[in-house]
Amino acid sequence: MKTFGSGDYRYQVVEGWGQIPQLGLVSGVACDSEDRVYVFNRSPQPAVLVFDADGTFLTSWGEGIFKHPHGIWISPDDEIFTTDRDDHTVRKFSLSGDLLMTIGTAGQAGEPGQPFNEPTRAVLSKSGQIYVSDGYGQSRVHRLTAEGGLILSWGSAGSGPGEFNLPHDVTVDRDDRVYILDRGNLRCQIFNSEGEYLTEWQDLRSPNDLFIGSDDIIHIAEGGQRVTIMTLEGEIVERWGEKGTAPGQFSDSPHGLWVDSTGDVYISEVVAERRFQKFARV
């Protein structure tokens, strides 16, 4: 079986994983504390499909809720946050799919500079505040209270520090540094919690999704059929990915990515082939 990557970061695709029923375009993936896998897809069927780590289908939920599923993220306390791009909303769910909170006005874009206009991802910081990348309709990042109240927004359209061309993903590390994948500008910008620019990483291909593990290792899903693995200091430790339709290859661009507690990597692609793959670390 072919191995992708090298050194400490070698992977083999798990062929046939999931036997996914009625899969739509897969925009995102996340795992809970038990390594159950939540596949977020655009389909007339339920938007969230749940599997165990071996690929056994467990349940589904979310039918009739979402207009355009985009980002999904699960906190260490097993709270699920989703972004619905075309509905301009962030939603919080329990693991069983109970809706706990909606932030934003369904079907209505926020005023310029205000939440939300086609948001892309929502996550929690260590202190429990919500960060949202926003998104396709405007070039902003929002920091909210745990209840959804606006604390701070920053960003504008452009290519300079603190400017964005499609902020496609937000992630916050344990020291409250905020990582924004600035997809249209082919970079990751890093800020403090007050929105002050710290630094940026370039040399990225249309970055889509960023995951920080408990070991402080970063995985980035990129356009151009690539996954980049980095340290928090920006040192690249591995890159892998091939174009194609064979198992382990990417026919388009990895769009969603998550790493479970064992180091296995799940990657989704938003393409007509409805591709979703698991890569086991070896």
Where are these regions (language model features)?
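Eukaryotic scaffold repeat domains enriched in small/polar residues
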Residues: M1-V282
